[in-house]
Amino acid sequence: METRALSVNLREVKKNGAAKLRQQGMVPAVVYHKGEETVAISVDEIALDKLVHSAESHLIDLQYPDGKSVRAFIKDLQFDPVTDRVIHADFKRFTADEVVEMEVPIHVEGEAVGVKIGGGKLQINMHTLTLKGKPANMPEHFTIDVSALETGHSLHISDLQATVPAGTIEIIGDADAAIVSVAAPRKEAEAEAEEETTEEA
């Protein structure tokens, strides 16, 4: 996974301080690590937005004015419900040998045979996956090829986990959860529903 640099400044936690920072185009944030004191920082809103809205996940090199830097990743974000701007960020610091949990985006490629030939509709049920492992093993995204997916079939978390080299990363979540599915054409689905109703009667 690629590492991106992000300049940060230390900040004082005081009344109305966060609001003033936002007016200056800065986002209040914190950096934390188990067993250590949480550090209050601020980051440039535009620079943070580029990371947040990237199609890839990244490890981040937080760079302080005194030349110090720490490795971290975005653990949590708070958004303004009206403007959708990032109003607060949590960064989790890590060490190279530490096992962490990170969200990475899902990239879907290919045209499902159930859509191309069967006339079905591709349903994407998840847009990110939560992965557990060492930072060096984390991918920037997870690519799913749906070309062979037929009507009425799904790709589950367990299917993806089977493609991951043993001992590298673990996909967190219900193994039976469907990531993508191909739904039957509407008329076919309605016919099946009517058939089930008739059988029940």
UniProtKB/Swiss-Prot annotation:
<comment type="similarity">
    <text>Belongs to the bacterial ribosomal protein bL25 family. CTC subfamily.</text>
</comment>
<dbReference type="InterPro" id="IPR001021">
    <property type="entry name" value="Ribosomal_bL25_long"/>
</dbReference>
<dbReference type="Pfam" id="PF01386">
    <property type="entry name" value="Ribosomal_L25p"/>
</dbReference>
<dbReference type="Pfam" id="PF14693">
    <property type="entry name" value="Ribosomal_TL5_C"/>
</dbReference>
<dbReference type="InterPro" id="IPR011035">
    <property type="entry name" value="Ribosomal_bL25/Gln-tRNA_synth"/>
</dbReference>
<dbReference type="InterPro" id="IPR029751">
    <property type="entry name" value="Ribosomal_L25_dom"/>
</dbReference>
<comment type="subunit">
    <text>Part of the 50S ribosomal subunit; part of the 5S rRNA/L5/L18/L25 subcomplex. Contacts the 5S rRNA. Binds to the 5S rRNA independently of L5 and L18.</text>
</comment>
<protein>
    <recommendedName>
        <fullName>Large ribosomal subunit protein bL25</fullName>
    </recommendedName>
</protein>
<dbReference type="InterPro" id="IPR020056">
    <property type="entry name" value="Rbsml_bL25/Gln-tRNA_synth_N"/>
</dbReference>
<dbReference type="GO" id="GO:0022625">
    <property type="term" value="C:cytosolic large ribosomal subunit"/>
</dbReference>
<keyword id="KW-0689">Ribosomal protein</keyword>
<keyword id="KW-0694">RNA-binding</keyword>
<dbReference type="GO" id="GO:0003735">
    <property type="term" value="F:structural constituent of ribosome"/>
</dbReference>
<dbReference type="GO" id="GO:0008097">
    <property type="term" value="F:5S rRNA binding"/>
</dbReference>
<dbReference type="GO" id="GO:0006412">
    <property type="term" value="P:translation"/>
</dbReference>
<dbReference type="InterPro" id="IPR020930">
    <property type="entry name" value="Ribosomal_uL5_bac-type"/>
</dbReference>
<keyword id="KW-0687">Ribonucleoprotein</keyword>
<dbReference type="InterPro" id="IPR037121">
    <property type="entry name" value="Ribosomal_bL25_C"/>
</dbReference>
<comment type="function">
    <text>This is one of the proteins that binds to the 5S RNA in the ribosome where it forms part of the central protuberance.</text>
</comment>
<dbReference type="InterPro" id="IPR020057">
    <property type="entry name" value="Ribosomal_bL25_b-dom"/>
</dbReference>
<keyword id="KW-0699">rRNA-binding</keyword>
